[in-house]
Design a protein with these regions (language model features):
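NTP-dependent small-molecule kinase module
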Residues: 3-22, 148, 166-196
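Pre-Walker A (Motif I) flank of P-loop NTPase domains
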Residues: 24-30, 131
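Conserved nucleotide-sensing/catalytic segment adjacent to the nucleotide-binding pocket
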Residues: 57-60, 65-117, 133
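Post-Walker A helix-loop "phosphate-sensing" segment adjacent to the P-loop in P-loop NTPases
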Residues: 47-57
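Conserved beta-strand scaffold positions in the cores of enzyme catalytic domains, especially
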Residues: 56-58, 153-155, 176-178
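ATP-dependent NMP and nucleoside kinases share a basic, alpha-helical "lid"
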Residues: 117-159
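Glycine-rich phosphate-binding P-loop
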Residues: 31-47
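A glycine- and Lys/Arg-enriched "phosphate-lid" helix/loop adjacent to the NTP-binding pocket
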Residues: 76-83, 145-170, 190-194
Length: 196
């Protein structure tokens, strides 16, 4: 099904074209990072991948939180604690990224933890074809220990970055594509900052 050619869809088609130029076949993982609006952007990006005929799956790092007690070790809602302790990257790799990359009949999970109820979710395993796309959204996906996991990354620059993340990960410098999504109807690509 062809999506209507709105400014947003046209911008997303361009991004899909760029990603496919980088990784035309095989298992492809695209990260959508940013402080806000990542879920809606990633949902729409996944739809455009589907429109192009790709077997596309969606996940959010928000479904890989750590238990509340572990997230608040440095105090409730501290910026450092939020950056360092919010997400369970080991589980993200073990049940989603690594099995997705294995291809074949290996199953993967797109969620592992329910933050609102503070409990693990029941395992729901998915499989995909050899040329599948996984679009994952959320904060801090371009941190140093994750950035090599993605075939491509989109950084939404419509929200101020958290200082510790910006300082440590420099997401604007490593993202494949920068997008200002402050007007969701008409997202605009942003030029990469000059190197210092």
């Amino acid at each position: 099904m062809m999506l209507p050619p709105t400014p947003r869809v046209l911008a997303l088609r361009e991004i899909v074209g760029d990603v496919r130029a980088l990784a035309p076949r095989g298992r492809v993982i695209v990260a959508v990072d940013g402080g806000g609006g990542t879920a809606a952007f990633a949902d729409d990006l996944a739809e455009v991948f589907r429109e192009a005929g790709s077997d596309t799956h969606r996940a959010s790092v928000g479904d890989f939180h750590r238990p509340r007690a572990d997230r608040t070790l440095l105090g409730p809602e501290t910026p450092t604690g939020f950056y360092r302790d919010s997400f369970d990257y080991g589980t993200l790799r073990r049940v989603l990224i690594d099995p997705f990359r294995m291809a074949g009949s290996t199953g993967f999970q797109t969620a592992a933890f329910d933050e609102a109820r503070d409990v693990p979710v029941e395992s729901r395993w998915e499989t995909a074809g050899p040329d599948a796309v996984l679009v994952i959204d959320g904060e801090f996906l371009l941190r140093p220990e994750l950035r090599r996991e993605w075939n491509a990354s989109v950084l939404l620059v419509n929200a101020p970055e958290r200082a510790i993340y910006e300082e440590e990960a420099r997401p604007r410098e490593v993202a494949t594509i920068l997008v200002d999504d402050s007007d969701p109807v008409a997202p605009v690509r942003v030029a990469r900052p000059e190197s210092a």
